[in-house]
């Protein structure tokens, strides 16, 4: 989902 995609681009989004 968006969170996973964001995590790939920016780890900050993951946390």
Curated annotation (Swiss-Prot):
The molecular function GO annotations come to: toxin activity
Q: How is it modified after translation?
A: Contains 2 disulfide bonds that can be either 'C1-C3, C2-C4' or 'C1-C4, C2-C3', since these disulfide connectivities have been observed for conotoxins with cysteine framework V (for examples, see AC P0DQQ7 and AC P81755).
Q: What name appears for this protein in its UniProt entry? A: Conotoxin tx5e
Print the domain comment field.
Answer: The cysteine framework is V (CC-CC).
What residues bear Threonine amide in this entry? 15
Q: Does the keyword Hydrolase apply?
A: no
Q: What is the lineage of its organism?
A: Eukaryota, Metazoa, Spiralia, Lophotrochozoa, Mollusca
Its subcellular locations are: Secreted
GO CC field: extracellular region
Q: Does the keyword Ribosomal protein apply?
A: no
Q: What is its main location?
A: secreted
Keyword list (alphabetical) reads: Amidation, Disulfide bond, Secreted, Toxin
Question: From which domain of life does this come?
Answer: Eukaryota
Per the UniProt record, the source organism is Conus textile (Cloth-of-gold cone)
Q: Which family does it belong to?
A: Belongs to the conotoxin T superfamily.
User: Which tissues and organs express this gene's product?
Assistant: Expressed by the venom duct.
């Amino acid at each position: 989902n968006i969170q996973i995609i964001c995590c790939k681009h920016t780890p900050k989004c993951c946390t």
